[in-house]
Amino acid sequence: IKENFIFFISSTSAHFSINSALIILSLFVNDKELGRFTLAYKVAFILRMVPVFFIQSALQQASKSFTKSKEEYKVYTSKYFKFGLLISFVISSLSFVFSDLIIYILAHEKINYSSNILSLISFVPFLAMLNFKNITYILVNDLKFILNKATFYTLIFMFISSLILSYLYGGYGMALSLLLTELFSFFI
C-alpha cells in the first residue's frame, strides 16, 4: 500500500503541475486573454504527450534489456532517446513555424496572441523529451520514491514560477514558466 500511495502522490503532483497552468493564469488575466492562451495551450498539451508515448513504448524493451545487460540497456535507450529527440524537435519546429496556420484552423480566424503563445510553448515536447533517459531509468528500477520527490519539486517550481511570471507578464509569463518547468524537471 505504501508503494502505491507514493506512486499516487507522484502521479497527482505531475497532474497538478501540468493542469494547473490555466487555473493560475486565470488569477492574473481577463477571460479574453485566458481563452486565447487556452487555444494555444491545448495544442501544446497534446504535443506534450509525444515524449510520454516514447517512454511507454520503450519501457518494456528497456526493462528486458536492463535485466540482460546494462550495456544493452544503455545502447537501446540511447538509440531510442536520439530518435525521440529528433521526432520531438521536428514536431516542435513544425508547430513553431506553422503556429499561425494551426491557430487559424482551430479558431477560424487569425489570433496573433494565440500564435505567439503557441510559438513559445511549441518546444515543450522537445524539452520534455530530454527527460526520457531519466524517467526510463527511474521506472525500470522501480524508484518510486525518487519519482515522487522529483515530481513534487517540479510541482513546487511550477507553482512559484507560474505565479510570479503570470503576475508579471500574463500569458507570456505562463508560457515561459512552462518552458522553465520542463528544463527544471530535466535537471533535478
Placement of each model-derived feature along the sequence:
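Interhelical loop/hinge segments that connect adjacent transmembrane helices in multipass membrane
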Residues: 1-18, 61-75
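Interfacial transmembrane-helix starts/ends
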Residues: 70-86, 93-98, 115-118
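Alpha-helical transmembrane segments of polytopic membrane transporters and translocases
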Residues: 5-8, 21-22, 35-51, 82-83
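Helix-loop junctions and terminal segments of transmembrane helices
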Residues: 44-70, 74-77, 135-140
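Interfacial segments at transmembrane-helix termini and the short loops linking adjacent helices
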Residues: 96-129, 172
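Membrane-interface junctions at transmembrane-helix termini in multi-pass inner-membrane proteins
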Residues: 123-153
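C-terminal transmembrane helix end/exit motif
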Residues: 1, 54-60, 129-137, 164, ...
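Membrane-interface helix-loop junctions in multi-pass transport and translocation proteins
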Residues: 33, 154-187
